[in-house]
Amino acid sequence: MDLTYFGHSTFQIETEDVTLLFDPFFEENPHTETDPGTLAPDVLLITHAHFDHFSDVEAVLEASDPLVISNFEITQYVQEEYGHDAIQPLNEGGSVEFDWGYVESTHARHSSSFPDGSYGGVPNGFVLELGDDVVYNTGDTAPFAEMKWVGDLWDVDVMLAPVGNVFTMGIYGALHSTEMVEPELVIPLHYDTFPPLETDLDAFEDAFDEAGYDTRVFGAGETAAL
């Protein structure tokens, strides 16, 4: 599979069977000049409703017709506000199988509200089985004990986790989460987008290397095979 990182928590995964876009944040994202209208994902996954994960949902929907997977409140909002009927509500612990893979919604310790301040439902992460690969996007979160269940139930190949601190866990919270999940590779998200999220990536890499975990820091716009 190929992963493209657009900065912050926005990334795309492409396999032979499907293209998945996560948490579309482009227009106000200082790390990318990508026009969301140029993307054509088959599936759009949204972890929660905060503006830095949701603000370009409408632009993506106008350009393509993806299946939207998210919590009940977000999928209802997408249907009612944008007139988009290709939705799959998926609350925490729920799962759905598709011909291209499997998606399960996981807990995330965070908050969620739409840009207008209305309730955005419960935030989530996602575990995805894509062929032989298992991907865990934690979503915006702090460490929580049930992360160990993810590690017990799946052999996670790639874990994507926030490291920017302040609004989510920082480097050492992400390391503690990694110790529970035991993935093959960790990719950092949610850093250096705004001044409160300035992150020492050398410290991130050093801490994980010392603990024996492989990491990969993507440049914004970078695509790599994983």
Curated annotation (Swiss-Prot):
Keywords, ordered alphabetically: Hydrolase
Record InterPro entries: Metallo-B-lactamas (IPR001279), RibonucZ/Hydroxyglut_hydro (IPR036866), UPF0173 (IPR022877), UPF0173_UPF0282_UlaG_hydrolase (IPR050114)
Protein name as it appears in the record: UPF0173 metal-dependent hydrolase SRU_1937
Matches recorded under Gene3D superfamilies: Ribonuclease Z/Hydroxyacylglutathione hydrolase-like
Gene Ontology terms for molecular function: hydrolase activity
SMART domains found in the cross-reference section: Lactamase_B
Pfam family, one: Lactamase_B_3
Source organism superkingdom: Bacteria
Family of this protein: Belongs to the UPF0173 family.
